[in-house]
Amino acid sequence: FAGFMEHTDVNIGRLVDAVEDIGELDNTIIIYIAGDNGTSAEGGFIGMYNEMTYFNQVTEKVEDLLPRLDEWGGEYTFPHMSAGWAVAFDAPFKWTKQVASDFGGTRNGMIVHWPDGIDSQGEIRNQFSHVIDIAPTILEAASLPEPTSVNGTVQEPMAGTSLMFSLNDADAP
């Protein structure tokens, strides 16, 4: 996960730099959703070097893991952090994605950057949203109607609700 995030961060940085180089950064809406429904606790109390051991009910021991410590995160490993770290990653919420009834298992961070379109800057929002709300948000931001037909194919109405109502009003319901 850390390697994925580092790679993602580098490439998002390249995209942001390119948009800034053409002078359109403040006029570009960037929506970044970080995560995939909370961290995973499959690593148990000590973590695991290879998630296949979990699926095959093989218990990894600390003495098995320590000699491989420098290999963790490499292209031939499928490690999981320990459950303690998983809970820490989901702070301030409780639990992990294995416990969907708690916010640690269901909430992800989202950043919306659009200085020319959002008056509020650097504020936190607590309204609930879903990934299905992103397309309606972009359409409203661009003042575009929802497509009813694409290349002659009639489209079903979009699910989701634009988030524009909450971007300038932290107290919006």
Regions found by a protein language model. Name each.
Residues 26-31, 89-91, 108-110, 127-130:
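Structural beta-strand/beta-sheet cores of well-ordered domains, especially the beta-sheet scaffolds
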Residues 1-28, 39-41, 45-86:
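A long, amphipathic alpha-helix that forms part
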Residues 8-9, 15-23, 37-45, 114-115, ...:
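A generic secondary-structure signal for well-formed alpha-helical elements
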Residues 32-39, 45-47, 100, 153-156:
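Short, solvent-exposed turn/loop segments enriched in Gly/Ser/Thr/Pro and often Arg
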Residues 105-115:
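Active-site-adjacent bridging/hinge elements
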Residues 75-103, 118-127, 132-173:
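C-terminal cap/loop subdomain of S1 sulfatases and analogous C-terminal strand-loop tails that border
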Residues 1, 113-119:
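Short glycine/proline-rich turn/loop motifs
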